[in-house]
Amino acid sequence: FHLNNLLWVWGANGPRDIPGDEAYAYRDFYPGAGYVDILGADVYHMDYEQKDYNELLNLAKGKPIALTECGQLPNSAILDAQPDWVWFLVWTNFIYSNNSKRQVNEVYDRPQTLTHKAP
């Protein structure tokens, strides 16, 4: 296909302590450093566990990590404790249905958050 300049992002469900949940430890399904440029986590239910973040960082071995999907935005305390996320993506309309205007403003107004501002 002659595809060049691609980044391969691996995004896994973040491990959770919810009975019947389908998420498992990241290492169980990680394909390996030779196949992945960026490691990601899908985090819902405000389940931003420090141990899971640390596990992903250890697995990444210096590669970037991202919140490939989230329902609730990580708040400032979480982002201060977990500063290595290179981006976050709020799934579909969850930006409005799962976050208050105050929560959205808190995250998007942080100096560390880059956004596209209209001219």
Predicted regions and their residues:
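Extracellular structured ligand-interaction cores
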Residues: 5, 36, 85
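Aromatic- and acid-rich polysaccharide-binding/catalytic face
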Residues: 26-47, 91
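Active-site-adjacent loop/helix micro-motif of nuclease/hydrolase catalytic cores
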Residues: 47-54
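Substrate-binding cleft of secreted/luminal carbohydrate-active enzymes
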Residues: 63-119
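Aromatic-lined carbohydrate-recognition surfaces of secreted/lumenal glycan-active proteins
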Residues: 1-24, 62-73
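Active-site beta-loop-alpha junctions enriched in small/polar residues
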Residues: 11-15, 41-46, 70-73, 90-95
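Acidic (Asp/Glu)-rich catalytic clusters
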Residues: 28-34, 58-59, 79-83
